[in-house]
């Protein structure tokens, strides 16, 4: 499996201010539980605006990036991101290349059997089409389309499930083309190489609001999104931070600023041994 990054620099220190803060207080997670001393190393695939993306200056932005920075700050750690494609994230976590997957990984029981996971965000699947395509309005309207999707994620799994549903109903089904990341999938849609892209509601809504693509179908296969860890002690510490952020209102404020729904759960850790 390729660990090719989508930027020249694999590691990005988010801000010197965050680093200075981490150095001015006592870390709440010992170095023995971290990949890099004093640092919360997080993997991200920044191809999902407004959740995570790279702005015109090359800086990481988005709700999940902000959340990761705040988690690190409250743990008195320096935030550091590794930009990597999703298909490499779980193997990289298991190999100890980063502490935390912070890319909006969908929570499933199968994943929670091999990782420590904290569900924190509600999401669902959308299908984006060209703005000129006004015919697709529901799942049945997707039948026969060539659609693009990121390789290896929940979105690909559900795209194949949708294909199976359509075929079981006696329809043609989908022609599915996988891409290393969502940026490439949306580029293919823009170029007319695919007729639709399967992504998450928040991303499809963003592109629709910009006038780039039309969000034709949304709300499919709703499921919680999580952060994920190999280390149980670190997961417990982050769970405590999220609970504190919910109590003091900062988590709700962050979600509201992006128009996103918070989960109804208690931000507890779910994983092996739980």
What does each of the following model-derived ranges do?
Residues 78-85, 149, 170-181:
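Short beta-strand-to-loop elements that line the ligand-binding cleft
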Residues 68-75, 155-178, 208-209:
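Ligand-binding cleft/hinge of the Venus flytrap
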Residues 24, 65-74, 133-136, 140-154, ...:
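Extended ligand-binding regions for polar small-molecule ligands
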Residues 69, 73, 78-141:
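Acidic, polar ligand-binding/catalytic clefts
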């Amino acid at each position: 499996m390729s660990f090719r990054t989508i930027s020249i620099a694999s590691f990005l220190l988010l801000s010197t201010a965050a680093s200075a803060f981490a150095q001015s207080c006592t870390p709440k997670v010992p170095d023995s539980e971290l990949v890099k001393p004093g640092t919360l190393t997080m993997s991200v695939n920044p191809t999902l605006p407004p959740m995570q993306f790279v702005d015109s200056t090359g800086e990481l932005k988005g709700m999940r990036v902000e959340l990761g920075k705040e988690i690190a700050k409250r743990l008195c750690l320096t935030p550091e991101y590794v930009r990597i494609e999703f298909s490499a994230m779980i193997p990289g976590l298991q190999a100890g290349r980063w502490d935390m997957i912070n890319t909006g990984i969908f929570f499933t029981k199968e994943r929670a059997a091999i990782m420590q996971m904290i569900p924190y965000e509600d999401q669902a699947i959308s299908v984006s089409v060209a703005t000129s395509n006004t015919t697709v309005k529901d799942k049945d309207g997707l039948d026969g389309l060539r659609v693009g999707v990121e390789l290896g994620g929940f979105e690909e799994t559900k795209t194949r499930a949708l294909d199976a549903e359509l075929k079981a109903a006696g329809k043609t089904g989908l022609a599915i083309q996988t891409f290393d990341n969502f940026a490439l999938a949306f580029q293919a849609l823009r170029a007319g190489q695919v007729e639709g892209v399967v992504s998450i509601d928040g991303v499809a809504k963003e592109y629709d609001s910009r006038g780039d693509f039309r969000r034709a179908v949304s709300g499919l296969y709703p499921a919680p999104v999580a952060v994920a860890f190999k280390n149980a002690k670190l997961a417990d510490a982050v769970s405590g931070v999220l609970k504190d952020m919910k109590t003091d209102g900062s988590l709700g404020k962050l979600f509201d600023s992006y128009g996103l729904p918070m989960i109804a759960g208690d931000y507890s850790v779910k994983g092996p041994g739980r």
